Regions:
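Acidic/glycine-rich C-terminal interaction modules and beta/coil loop segments
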Residues: 36-150
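Short boundary motifs at domain starts and secondary-structure transition points
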Residues: 31-35
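Extended boundary segments
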Residues: 1-30, 146-150
Length: 150
């Protein structure tokens, strides 16, 4: 059956074959940066917990001005640790929002330390955090991967 427009002509879409969906893990949602923009920093990716977005050995590009939590977005978060000279530990996380079943206006944030899609059977998380507390702990949003120009 040929699709037709309202004028009775064959639809342009009928000339194009349907393309089946094919998962392509090598494609990413993050931009590749050959140079580091002002107001950004890099952070080494220690493992494949956030694959396919980030891979072990790469450097995540972190926007230091953007630290408001957002559902499903990757961030660099800081935790206090007095055993370390600087007093802080840094880690990559994906923020997850949960709403209270009793009061949907009440929300809390959790920092997941891996993506379920990355193959981890169990996802460790920290929280709950209020929006304000999460914003204080988040160093910045991961906006890309640093690939130095050669």
């Amino acid at each position: 059956m040929t699709r037709r427009t309202s004028a009775g002509r064959p639809s342009p879409a009928s000339h194009f074959p349907a393309i089946p969906f094919e998962h392509q893990p090598e494609l990413r949602a993050l931009m590749m940066f050959p140079t580091l923009p002002p107001g950004h920093m890099t952070f080494p990716v220690p493992d494949d917990a956030f694959y396919p977005h980030l891979r072990r050995g790469e450097f995540a590009v972190v926007d230091l001005a953007d630290h408001q939590p957002a559902e499903g977005e990757l961030f660099l978060i800081t935790y206090r640790d007095q055993r370390i000279e600087s007093g802080h530990v840094y880690a990559l996380c994906a923020m997850h929002l949960k709403r209270s079943r009793v009061d949907p206006a009440r929300t809390s944030w959790y920092a997941r330390h891996s993506l379920p899609e990355a193959g981890a059977g169990v996802t460790l998380s920290e929280g709950p955090f209020t929006t304000e507390h999460a914003a204080e702990k988040l160093v910045g949003r991961v906006v890309g991967v640093w690939v130095p120009a050669r």
